[in-house]
Amino acid sequence: MKPDFVTLISEPRSDYTLIDSGHGRKYESYGDRHFIRPEPQAMWAPALDEWPADAEFVPGSDDDGGGRWYNNKPVPMDGWPLSWNDEVHFTASCTPFRHLGFFPDMDPVWRWMRGQLAGVTDPVAMNLFGYTGVGTLALSAAGAQMVHVDASKKSVGQARANAEMSGMADRPIRWIVDDAAKFVAREVRREKRYDGILLDPPKYGRGPEGEVWRLEEDLPELIANCRKLLDAESKFLFLTVYAVRMSALALGG
């Protein structure tokens, strides 16, 4: 499959809106709650003078993460319900990783993928590093048979709970707690085939059996194996890399 460079733009919607950004931060609404989070690429000045927020995540002093949330208003510790496209219902929460348990900027990606699979009979797709499953459920809601893979038992448990919330518990979704690279290698040996693969790998991580993942070292082999699970009729291999500052051209090479 030849790399395809497409600009995807997310439109404002009821569940999420990017209200403003600047000075290394962004101001967002998630439903009726407002949050401030770091955004290193927002180097310009904000448009608004004030950002009244329920909570703000203040990062640590280095690029490797860290930091904490500071609440200006009470925020439920066990999360609160949100939805995507009035189809996927899930629990959002202020995580230690500066996000809220899902990635709203993936909205145009999920819509694009659904469009790619729209003409496929019984499409089968895989979500690697699938986290809490909002992307998995977005594709499942459009009729795809899904394989959801994440090394975290807790994340997969939350993804299954989100499927229950969405009324999708009986959908054809395989929930896999496993090291993504090992699982994909086994799928290659099994000669499996997919219509689409989405992966969102971290910079560094550990599998359920202590496997170590380092993006710069392990990504090329994983991508090579993913390509073996696709054929000329497959619709996409979609890689997101928020964890490191690489251009699409570098990744495409």
Task: Give the label of every model feature segment.
Residues 132-144:
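Conserved SAM-binding loop of SAM-dependent methyltransferases across substrates and taxa
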Residues 152-198:
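S-adenosyl-L-methionine
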Residues 201-202:
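Switch II (G3) loop of P-loop NTPases
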